[in-house]
Amino acid sequence: MAVEMFYDADADLSIIQGRKVAVIGYGSQGHAHSLSLRDSGVEVKVGLKEGSKSRDKVTEQGLDVDTPAEVAKWADVIMLLAPDTAQAEIFTKDIEPNLEDGNALFFGHGLNIHFGLIKPPANVTIGMVAPKGPGHLVRRQFVDGKGVPCLIAVDQDPKGEGQALALSYAAAIGGARAGVIKTTFKDETETDLFGEQAVLCGGTEELVKTGFDVMVEAGYEPELAYFEVLHELKLIVDLMYEGGIARMNYSVSDTAEFGGYLSGPRVIDADTKKRMQDILKDIQDGTFVKRLVANVEGGNKELEGLRKQNAEHPIEVTGKKLRDLMSWVDRPITETA
């Protein structure tokens, strides 16, 4: 079944312009949403806890800021863009006591609603607007008169206005200039988590580290291994990003293309696919989210342990040394702090 797509001509910007919007959180997405909503003629306030380091930045950029509870009380549309693991507490403490009949609660990701970590009252519209790009790109494209494609979804719609409101919001941050795709909280959440775990973060990271280990254990210099399995990965991903797998294969040498066809299926085989299916099942049945919640309730001890273990891999030592030679590479905060 083809996805439903919407564009500026399908959206009524006046809907969101007639509402008061609170954006809770001012990270990557929060700043892009807030500034673009304001520039689209929407009345916006940003919700940040007292003492937040981002408060000065908000006021410097000409936006009003108050506590999450106060902006939730003021608004009739609340966009919750705090980290996933903080959202349930913010909802219970700051948002739920201030919700009124007819309010709308929006999210940039469906995890907390789909897995029942947040249970909103039945008289509130529950929607999602999820740009498919980082906040700095969302904002830059908006300023340039363009946009980043967005997903929208409605999980609860007591007044029958959810889709029109979500589409209007997406248009106000530039999404409808590029295209807005209708989905569900379930599909957005499960596909997003699977992509992160099996391919983008977990899968790619382990592939790179294992490739590095194989070469170093075979006697090759760590510096050569780093260049071949990590540094050059960006070149390949950029080609795929621009034109798909076909563009990448067209652009590399015949030797690389031929070798990739022969050896790729030996690395990622039917057993790998079965394990990826198991990962998807753990996401779908809530196994992963239960472990995520247990980690948070345990003070992030499991996550901190995994971070420490990962940081000690030899590829990190080699990489830092080589990046010192690369004047064109922006140094990450982990190496400049």
Swiss-Prot record:
Its cofactor is Mg(2+). Substrate binds at residue 253. Binds 2 magnesium ions per subunit. This is Ketol-acid reductoisomerase (NADP(+)). It comes from Mycolicibacterium gilvum (strain PYR-GCK) (Mycobacterium gilvum (strain PYR-GCK)). The gene is ilvC. Its EC number is 1.1.1.86. Residues 3-183 form the KARI N-terminal Rossmann domain. It is an enzyme of class 1 (oxidoreductase). GO terms for cellular component: cytosol. The keyword Magnesium applies. Mg(2+) 1 binds at residues 192, 196. GO terms for molecular function: ketol-acid reductoisomerase activity; magnesium ion binding; NADP binding. Mg(2+) 2 binds at residues 192, 228, 232. Belongs to the ketol-acid reductoisomerase family. It comes from the Bacteria. The active site is at 109. SUPFAM superfamilies: 6-phosphogluconate dehydrogenase C-terminal domain-like, NAD(P)-binding Rossmann-fold domains. Residues 184-329 form the KARI C-terminal knotted domain. NADP(+) binds at residues 26-29, 49, 52, 54, 84-87, 135.
